[in-house]
Amino acid sequence: MIILVKRRKKWLSFTLTAGAALLLTACGGGNEEASDNNAGTDGEKVSIEFWSFWGSGLRRDAIEEIIEDFNTSQDEIEVEYVYQPWGDIWTKSLASIAAGDPPDVIVQDINSVQQRAEAEQSTNIQEYIEQDGNEMESTFYPHLWETVFYEDNAYALPFNTDTQVLFYNKDAFEEAGLDPETPPATWEELEEYARALDVKDGNSWERIGFYPLWNLGADVWALNADNGVSWFDKEGNVKINTPKKVEALEWVLEWQDYYGPETINSYEAEFGNGVADPFISGLVGIRAQNINYYTNLLENAPEDFNFGVAPLPEYEEGSGNWSWGGGFVLEIPKGAENPEASYEFMKYLTSTEVQEKFGLNSFDIMANQEANTNLIEHPDLDEEGQMIYEMADRNLESTVITPVPLKAPDFSPLVNEQIDGAMLGNQSAQEALDAAQASVENLVEQNQ
């Protein structure tokens, strides 16, 4: 289903305090269990430390109020929130684990859960899940739940995720004679639409219809073309130089040749945030982007900015609207003093009510399936916001998560350097992916 949205001035009537009473319910169910796990004794609260990189804006406001709700709704666990800057949080976490003084709960990358579990940097939480009757599995989207396991034991709980989609300028569509209610459905149509949207004055491009590598990588288009198979398949086999992936890289190179590297580089030099965003400013007609990009439009686009959202187009009709997603999980670092209390807080953060609240204030795609479903028709979201969540929920059905293989944790540079060589004209797409295939196969062999 295609979601078509129009900019509204009042996008969200929900306020942070409005959901406080509702959130007490999410915590209430965990009080007795926390007591059973001896989280607190003699009437004293167990103090735990929670690290994340949400340091400003709506996410910080939301998480701080969620923590306050948790702390005041029960008398056994007290959570202290510690902001750590993006990039620093994980190096500091490793240092704290090595020093024997880690935080109690931390937000971590969803694609590297197995690496941390294998390295004994995180805590096995399987026993806590089993004590709850294995009810957690049904809470989350299946492809997210699969990421938290190492050797059949869970080491994390999924928190949020994302998915890549197309944003397109509906007014530009009308100007170019395109139907604004019918975005491109295949790669062939995407090319046709982009050519119609292009505006050129002499040798100068006033508008570029679409360029596939602005905001997405070649890896996303490769899996889109290859039936959702990324550089590795589900069995861990290296699948870099498949025919479809070679065709995908050739397709990307054709886009670069059409506009020219100089044009692409000069456009990129003009890109910025806010009103300088190339999609908002009209420099680009169609933009492939994480669906959370919607928050940027809410904050910076004019009130009358008229845009649509659609799935990434199929490689060819019937091949599937495959997309890529990432996300984050909640983990208990190895050596945390109070894992029972930590797990209770993690359950709270992934409960339906709390996930709804965080989603309402961030437009993150939450890991809790029921929370996302509720947000589709949530009364505190306007029609536009509800449509974004409906689009996200549907798109997750064809969204692929790509956990880093244990036998090739450092494979990405080997692939990227070959793709870069092709983009620079030093080798063909076939040569680039053949070389990447050989290099990664060698890496896997070394790590057997």
Question: What kind of region is each of these model predictions?
Answer:
Residues 1-49, 72, 431-434, 438-448:
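Short, low-complexity disordered leader/linker segments with a strong preference
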Residues 65, 69-143, 174-177, 182-185, ...:
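Extracytoplasmic "Venus flytrap"/periplasmic binding protein-like
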Residues 68, 72-73, 78, 176, ...:
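Extracytoplasmic/periplasmic substrate-recognition and gating elements
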Residues 75, 143, 310-311, 360-413:
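Long, aromatic- and glycine/proline-rich binding clefts that accommodate carbohydrate-like moieties
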Residues 110-165, 222-224, 306-310, 377-384, ...:
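Hinge/lid segment of periplasmic solute-binding proteins
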Residues 150-159, 164, 174, 188-241, ...:
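Extracytoplasmic/periplasmic solute-binding protein
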Residues 174-175, 180, 199, 394-448:
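Conserved C-terminal helix/tail region of periplasmic/extracytoplasmic solute-binding proteins
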Residues 193-195, 237-266, 312:
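Glycine-centered hinge/linker elements that transmit conformational signals in sensory
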